[in-house]
């Protein structure tokens, strides 16, 4: 019996390895209804880097219903959105060189995908982070929290 339990544990450990590796990335989708399919993302402190894979699952073009994924401290979100509107679509609705932006994808149209990888060292335990779409008017609905966890 002990050998069976031990063997089962070894088998579970072998199958969990890919799952553990996948914890340093997340897939997230944005729709034509101005929604992300996730409202919260947890990033393990054990990750050196974290990757966000964004897919726009809608059909509308980027100039009509474009979506991106932007990460900032929660306190910076509104100012980043405001400055992004002035920057325009050609700049991904983000002010050039904005140090408040910790990571972002490009603005996507329906059917498009993009990824961004960032250093987890940019995040501090206890700080509040928000991810959102910076396309004008989208941030009110298309946002969520990102949290650094053990």
Swiss-Prot record:
PROSITE patterns hit by this protein: COPPER_BLUE
Main subcellular location: periplasm
Disulfide bonds listed in the record: 24-47
Endpoints of the signal sequence: 1-21
Annotated binding of Cu cation, by residue: 67, 133, 138, 142
Sequence intervals crossing the membrane: none
Cellular localisation: Periplasm
GO molecular function (one): electron transfer activity
Family annotation (NCBIfam families): azurin
Protein's name in the database: Azurin
Organism for this UniProt entry: Bordetella pertussis (strain Tohama I / ATCC BAA-589 / NCTC 13251)
């Amino acid at each position: 019996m002990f050998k069976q339990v031990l063997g089962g544990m070894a088998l579970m450990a072998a199958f969990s390895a890919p799952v553990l590796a996948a914890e340093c990335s997340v897939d997230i989708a944005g729709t034509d209804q101005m929604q992300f399919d996730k409202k919260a993302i947890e990033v393990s402190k054990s990750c050196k880097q974290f990757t966000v894979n964004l897919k726009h699952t809608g059909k509308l073009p980027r100039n009509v219903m474009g979506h991106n994924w932007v990460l900032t401290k929660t306190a910076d979100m509104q100012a980043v959105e405001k400055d992004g509107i002035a920057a325009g679509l050609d700049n991904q609705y983000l002010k050039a060189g904005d140090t408040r932006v910790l990571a972002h994808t490009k603005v996507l149209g329906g059917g498009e995908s993009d990824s961004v990888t960032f250093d987890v060292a940019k995040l501090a335990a206890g700080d509040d982070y928000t991810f959102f779409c910076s396309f004008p008017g989208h941030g009110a609905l298309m946002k969520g929290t990102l949290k650094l966890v053990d």
